[in-house]
Design a protein with these regions (language model features):
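Iron-associated oxidoreductase/ferritin-like identity signal
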Residues: 1-182
Length: 182
C-alpha cells in the first residue's frame, strides 16, 4: 500500500515528503493538545468552569481521535512517527496549550481558542496542498478541519467573540472523523 499510495500522491503533484512532515507535525499537535487539554479541563472549576468542562472534555477526546485517524495515513504514505516522545513533542505544529499562570476560566478559554486556531491553520494548509490531488488525505484533513472549526467556535462563543452558530453535538465520535477510526 505504501508504494502505491505515495506514487499516486506524487503523480498528482503533491510533494509527499512535505505532506508527511505536515501530517506528523499535526499528529504531534493533536497528541500534545490531548495531554494539555487534560490539565486545562481539570482546572475548569467553579460554576463557570463546570459549565465548560464537558465541552473541553469532548474537544480533548476528539483531538485524541484526530491523532488516531492521522496515524494510518502517515504510514500509508511511507512515513512514521518519531520513536522519541520528547522529539515528537518538539515538532508539534502548534505551541503547547499550557495552563496559564492565572488559571481563571477566561484565561483557560483564551488558551483553548488559540490552540484551536492553530489547528485550523494547520489543516487548512494540508487541505490546500491536497485538494483535487490526494483525495484520501484531503478527505481526512477536511474532516478534522471541520471539527477544529467547531471546537474553536464553541470556545470563542464563551469569550463573546462570535455568534452562536454552532452547538455541541452529544455523539460519542465526531460525525466527520468517525469513518477514519473504523
Amino acid at each position: 500500500m505504501t508504494k502505491v499510495a505515495r506514487e499516486v500522491v506524487e503523480k498528482a503533484g503533491v510533494n509527499a515528503d512535505k505532506l508527511l512532515e505536515l501530517l506528523v507535525k499535526n499528529a504531534s499537535a493533536e497528541l500534545t493538545t490531548y495531554y494539555y487539554y487534560t490539565i486545562l479541563r481539570a482546572n475548569l472549576i467553579g460554576l463557570e468552569g463546570e459549565t465548560l468542562k464537558e465541552i473541553a472534555e469532548i474537544a480533548r477526546i476528539e483531538d485524541r481521535n484526530h491523532f488516531e485517524a492521522l496515524v494510518p495515513r502517515i504510514y500509508e504514505l511511507g512515513g512514521k512517527l518519531l520513536d522519541d516522545m520528547k522529539k515528537f513533542y518538539d515538532i508539534s505544529a502548534c505551541p503547547p496549550a499550557k495552563l496559564p499562570e492565572n488559571p481563571s476560566v477566561q484565561e483557560i478559554l483564551k488558551v483553548l481558542v488559540e490552540a484551536e486556531r492553530c489547528t485550523v491553520r494547520g489543516y487548512t494548509q494540508i487541505c490546500n496542498m491536497t485538494a483535487g490531488k490526494d483525495h484520501r488525505t484531503y478527505d481526512l484533513a477536511l474532516a478534522i478541519l471541520n471539527k477544529e472549526i467547531e471546537h474553536k467556535s464553541w470556545f470563542s462563543e464563551f469569550l463573546g467573540e462570535g455568534s452562536s452558530g454552532y452547538f455541541m453535538r452529544r455523539e460519542e465520535l465526531s460525525q466527520f472523523v468517525s469513518k477514519f477510526l473504523k
